[in-house]
Amino acid sequence: MKIKALSKLKPEEGIWLTEVEKPEMGHNDLLIRIKKTAICGTDVHIYNWDEWSQKTIPVPMVVGHEYVGEVVGIGQEVRGFEIGDRVSGEGHITCGHCRNCRGGRTHLCRNTTGVGVNRTGAFSEYLVIPAFNAFKIPAGISDDLASIFDPFGNAVHTALSFDLVGEDVLITGAGPIGIMAAAVAKHVGARHVVITDVNEYRLDLAKKMGVTRAVNVMNEKLEDVMSDLGMTEGFDVGLEMSGNPSAFNSMLTNMNHGGKISLLGIPPSDMTVDWNQVIFKGLVIKGIYGREMFETWYKMASLIQSGLDLTPIITHHYKIDDFQKGFDMMRSGMSGKVILDWE
């Protein structure tokens, strides 16, 4: 049976709507009928066919890894799921046999493969994943929100790596993940949450999500913002979401002694760092990759159930046949999360 899918068909700029064979599930898998998908920054990299994509993405391949759908098939060894369950899923497929997997630290699996990156993705009418990777969506959480659980998980993992209650938090990079991390920080009790970027559209979006200050670093100095807020010692926690070297070095400059930094943004490999700031301030830096399985997922659901409102981050919806408009919108930088509807 042929189904619709968005695929990387050629080693050049673009994504194409095509037909592929419906995937077949194994004994330990679920077959999921996709309802909605969201476009990730990674999908934009794949669309643009940048240096990372050229090294990483097999062609041809169905892409995409942010989704919500309904279980329509269950492998014979699978327990705990029923036909009709609403699910999203962890996009990192882990090996199960390395030391970290066996020690319960599956997000650190050295043999991880990615849905829509190294194996068939979710931009399709149907997806097969290991049942281990599926996460049931509680009633009361909308399909729209469920479809962005993957990037929301990046935000939650990054933000909740350190205690935020009563702390002053600096977030560099107001992409959708940075903005969601800011909303999480405010929701769990941070005092001042300051986010920086140069994109006014996204800074306005951050204001709608409740940040203390959204700072365009082209027009305003962080030192002046800290002074306005009555901060005399620097930020307690930093969340680096941009991969921008000057943003990271500005963060180091403005951290308090003993401050803690989560790094999610991917910088150039030759980024220059003022390590004296790290050493003499006694800073702690933690690299963040993906989501903790599945502690982050439970936290995500609980945060929404306890009143965290992420709806402003979803700014655009398109039918799957209009996927090109969705990618154009994401590439323009004038959007939050963009949802593609498969129904």
Swiss-Prot record:
One of its GO terms (biological process) is L-threonine catabolic process to glycine. It holds the Pfam family ADH_N. InterPro entries: ADH-like_C, ADH-like_N, ADH_Zn_CS, GroES-like_sf, L-Threonine_3-DHase, NAD(P)-bd_dom_sf, PKS_ER, Zn_alcohol_dh. It catalyses: L-threonine + NAD(+) = (2S)-2-amino-3-oxobutanoate + NADH + H(+). NAD(+) binds at I177, D197, R202, L264, G265, I266, I288, Y289. It is an enzyme of class 1 (oxidoreductase). One of its GO terms (cellular component) is cytoplasm. The keyword Zinc applies. Binds 2 Zn(2+) ions per subunit. Catalyzes the NAD(+)-dependent oxidation of L-threonine to 2-amino-3-ketobutyrate. Homotetramer. Pathway: Amino-acid degradation; L-threonine degradation via oxydo-reductase pathway; glycine from L-threonine: step 1/2. This is L-threonine 3-dehydrogenase. Zn(2+) 1 binds at C40, H65, E66. The record marks D150 as: Important for catalytic activity for the proton relay mechanism but does not participate directly in the coordination of zinc atom. Its EC number is 1.1.1.103. HAMAP family: Thr_dehydrog. Keywords: Cytoplasm, Metal-binding, NAD, Oxidoreductase, Zinc. Belongs to the zinc-containing alcohol dehydrogenase family. GO terms for molecular function: L-threonine 3-dehydrogenase activity; zinc ion binding. Zn(2+) 2 binds at C95, C98, C101, C109. Its cofactor is Zn(2+). The active site is at T42 (charge relay system), H45 (charge relay system). PROSITE patterns: ADH_ZINC. It is found in: Cytoplasm.
